[in-house]
Amino acid sequence: MKKQKTTTQKPKLTYRVNEQIRVPEVRIVFQDGTQQVMKTIEARRMAEDRNLDLIEVQPNAEPPVCKLDNLGKLLFKMDKRDKDLKKKQKTTTLKELRFHPNTDKHDFDFKTAHLEEFLRKGNRVRATIVFLGRSIIYKDKGLELAERLTERLSCVSNRDGDPKFEGKKLFVYFEPDKKKIDAFERIKAKTSGPAPAPAPLPVPAPEQKETPE
């Protein structure tokens, strides 16, 4: 079997051009901003004289608005614009770290440093506060921890909604904020230079199973 050739799809032109424009009159907008209403046949002739194309940009206007431009260059600009937009659209990955309502200061600082690093790289993060055994009676501690996380990560993110309980877990989501991250990076660069990467995370232990009491 012959392999099918893959072809790059060119951007589709939304409006009509040249002979496709069949209305009697059009309004031409020139590069200097001036406008002129003329017969379509005259506008096409003008475009040909200038080695340009007559391109309709506002088909619903009365009469339709057109401009004189190079169709090939216009398609190239549209293609470049689409590629630039795709480059800017980064896929967001959800990163998660687990806490307990009685998480000590060292563990809290260690894990929030990693959450902060994830956010600075443009990732969405989820902090999961796990209540083991009868610790679910200390929901207030979990909510206090969620507020501490929110305050600590506020320099690079925004909390996405309120903390939510599901069974014996409390979920807190954070979205990266580019403006905050840029400001944070500038301040950090001025004060201490490039920030060292946080220590590697340990391999998480299997979640403990509850035993009947």
Curated annotation (Swiss-Prot):
Question: What name has this protein been given in UniProt?
Answer: Translation initiation factor IF-3
Q: Is Transmembrane set as a keyword in this record?
A: no
- List all disulphide bridges recorded for this chain: none
UniProt lists compositionally biased (Pro residues) regions at: 195-205
Main localization is cytoplasm
What exactly does this protein do?
A: IF-3 binds to the 30S ribosomal subunit and shifts the equilibrium between 70S ribosomes and their 50S and 30S subunits in favor of the free subunits, thus enhancing the availability of 30S subunits on which protein synthesis initiation begins.
Q: Where in the cell is it found?
A: Cytoplasm
Q: What organism does this protein naturally occur in?
A: Chlorobium limicola (strain DSM 245 / NBRC 103803 / 6330)
